[in-house]
């Protein structure tokens, strides 16, 4: 009897929870009740598997989330964003991330060009905590998109300014923001279209190579195994392109060729393997002249 009662109780609780979800979604439409609804729904986004379709298909909900984003544009420049404003808009961004990563809503999310609403946040440079949290949460939405490995995501992102935005954050952001931005670049590079796009012109490739080189130098002074892993993977993927491979033979940082990172990577067999493969890729196809000088193949 106890077991039966427990089952009924759990089912009843689930129904109550669903009713609360519906109530909070409705409350998003009203400015008076929106802040609490954002907070409660963002807490539930992991446990309610169909929250994304519910948000997308309910009347006025996405418009309300976009209104939350647009409302803080004036606080970006000049940078006056408060912790309270940042927390509130990041709850809205968390719900958009939920929509971005769900298979039923992702295509519509891209078709509506919603990621573009986040780009002004990625342009910010203020180092204060509210801005850092805002940038990191915005990167999380883009990261959720690329994590799906869907071709349509890469095709969409390549029509936008996401690569230069990520490169700027990779150069000057916090370690966590740098890590997510580098992960996004890595995912773009791992797609054949993305690799071809970045290696299409010298300007694009050299910008990426320059920032990665600066990061290696910085990592040699302030090591981060997690960030280094993504940097090495970006380099390895670039070496799959013949033109990029030629250029990398000249500009790959010495720190990736010597023992600078041996201690950082001692327990990371995957990154060590990638690094060894990168060095091997750059050595293959080289011709040595009689004086022992490596010459690039024609």
Curated annotation (Swiss-Prot):
Q: Which InterPro entries match?
A: ARM-like, ARM-type_fold, CNOT9
Q: Which range is the signal sequence, renumbered to this chain?
A: none
Q: Where are the transmembrane segments?
A: none
Q: Which domain of life is it from?
A: Eukaryota
Entry-linked Gene3D superfamilies: Leucine-rich Repeat Variant
A GO BP annotation: negative regulation of intracellular estrogen receptor signaling pathway
Its localization reads:
Nucleus; Cytoplasm, P-body
Keyword Protein transport recorded: no
GO terms (molecular function) for this protein are: transcription coactivator activity
Give yes or no: UniProt keyword Metal-binding. Answer: no
| GO cellular component annotations of the record | CCR4-NOT complex; CCR4-NOT core complex; nucleus; P-body
Keyword line = Activator, Cytoplasm, Nucleus, Repressor, RNA-mediated gene silencing, Transcription, Transcription regulation, Translation regulation
Q: Partners and quaternary state?
A: Homodimer. Component of the CCR4-NOT complex.
Q: What the protein does?
A: Component of the CCR4-NOT complex which is one of the major cellular mRNA deadenylases and is linked to various cellular processes including bulk mRNA degradation, miRNA-mediated repression, translational repression during translational initiation and general transcription regulation. Additional complex functions may be a consequence of its influence on mRNA expression. Involved in down-regulation of MYB- and JUN-dependent transcription. Enhances ligand-dependent transcriptional activity of nuclear hormone receptors. May play a role in cell differentiation.
Question: What does the sequence similarity comment in the record state about its family?
Answer: Belongs to the CNOT9 family.
The UniProt entry, under PANTHER family, shows: CCR4-NOT TRANSCRIPTION COMPLEX SUBUNIT 9
Protein name, please?
CCR4-NOT transcription complex subunit 9
Q: Which organism is it from?
A: Danio rerio (Zebrafish)
Taxonomy, top ranks, is: Eukaryota, Metazoa, Chordata, Craniata, Vertebrata
Gene name tied to this protein: cnot9
């Amino acid at each position: 009897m106890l077991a039966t009662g427990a089952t009924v109780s759990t089912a009843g609780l689930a129904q109550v929870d669903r009713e609360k979800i519906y109530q909070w979604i409705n409350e998003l439409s009203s400015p008076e009740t929106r802040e609490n609804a954002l907070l409660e729904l963002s807490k539930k986004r992991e446990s309610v598997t169909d929250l994304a379709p519910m948000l997308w298909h309910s009347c006025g909900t996405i418009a309300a989330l976009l209104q939350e984003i647009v409302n803080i544009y004036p606080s970006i420049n000049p940078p006056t964003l408060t912790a309270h404003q940042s927390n509130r808009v990041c709850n809205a961004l968390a719900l958009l991330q939920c929509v971005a990563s769900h298979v039923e809503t992702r295509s519509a999310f891209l078709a509506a060009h919603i990621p573009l609403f986040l780009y002004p946040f990625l342009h910010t440079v203020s180092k204060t905590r509210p801005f850092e949290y805002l940038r990191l949460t915005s990167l999380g939405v883009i990261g959720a998109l690329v994590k799906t490995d869907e071709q349509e995501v890469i095709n969409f992102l390549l029509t936008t300014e996401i690569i230069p935005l990520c490169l700027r954050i990779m150069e000057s952001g916090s370690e966590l923001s740098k890590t997510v931005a580098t992960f996004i670049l890595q995912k773009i590079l791992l797609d054949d279209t993305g690799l071809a796009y970045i290696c299409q012109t010298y300007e694009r490739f050299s910008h990426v190579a320059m920032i990665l080189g600066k990061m290696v130098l910085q990592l040699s002074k302030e090591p981060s195994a997690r960030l280094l892993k993504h940097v090495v993977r970006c380099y390895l993927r670039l070496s799959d392109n013949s033109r990029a491979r030629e250029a990398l033979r000249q500009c790959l940082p010495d720190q990736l060729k010597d023992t600078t990172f041996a201690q950082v990577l001692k327990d990371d067999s995957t990154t060590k393997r990638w690094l060894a493969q990168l060095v091997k890729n750059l050595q293959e196809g080289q011709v040595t002249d009689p004086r022992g000088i490596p010459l690039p193949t024609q």
